[in-house]
């Protein structure tokens, strides 16, 4: 039977999940000094065959991760990761076991928060309107300065609660990822409240999430 993979964790604790993707049973098993979580999907086409089905399945997938995150730190598989059977899953884990083992130890007892910054005045610009090279460079420098200002403020106010920051640009927004020990959650939220408004920027916080952006060590990520 095809398997849909959720995540791997430390071998203990084992988290019992009532319902998984497509209302299936969530199975967990210890293997290779890890614990894997998955569901058997008898008919992937009916479960994931159209946009609405995929949307519902994604909600259920994230609900499973949230329940696991409440008790331990999951290292998620990209949704949807479907494998042919348990033998194929074992082979995948064996192929990446060192990465997974390192990740579950390094990220043990951590959470991830995300902050997305947008600049409303910039979003109202007409991307189709031609601009000169000088104007383009000016706008680019202004955008970099805006990002740098937010970056500096976030890191300054949260220095005592965040273990590591990562970020990436997106179309008309910039996204930051904060990795923090589970016990620093309230302190982190409180520190953001002290930051005050960022001029011209709108910030949106979400989380906590599994620390998926930090699975690869920084030296390999950069």
Protein language model annotation of sequence segments:
Residues 1-222:
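An interfacial alpha-helical scaffold signature
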């Amino acid at each position: 039977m095809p398997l849909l993979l959720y995540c791997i964790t430390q071998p203990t604790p084992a988290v019992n999940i009532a319902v998984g993707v497509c209302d299936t049973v969530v199975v967990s098993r210890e293997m290779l000094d890890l614990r894997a979580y998955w569901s058997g999907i008898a008919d992937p086409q009916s479960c994931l065959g159209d946009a609405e089905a995929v949307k519902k399945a994604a909600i259920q997938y994230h609900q499973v991760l949230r329940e696991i995150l409440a008790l331990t730190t999951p290292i998620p598989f990209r949704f949807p990761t479907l494998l042919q059977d348990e033998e194929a899953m074992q082979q995948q884990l064996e192929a990446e076991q060192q990465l997974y083992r390192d990740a579950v130890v390094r990220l043990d007892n951590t959470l991830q928060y995300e902050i997305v910054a947008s600049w409303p005045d910039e979003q109202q610009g007409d991307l189709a309107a031609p601009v000169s090279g000088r104007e383009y460079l000016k706008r680019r420098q202004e955008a970099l300065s805006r990002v740098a200002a937010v970056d500096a403020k976030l890191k300054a106010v949260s220095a005592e609660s965040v273990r590591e920051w990562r970020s990436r640009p997106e179309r008309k927004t910039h996204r930051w990822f904060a990795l923090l020990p589970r016990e620093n959650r309230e302190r982190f939220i409180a520190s953001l409240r002290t930051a005050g408004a960022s001029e011209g920027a709108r910030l949106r916080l979400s989380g906590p999430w599994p620390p998926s952006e930090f699975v690869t060590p920084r030296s390999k990520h950069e």
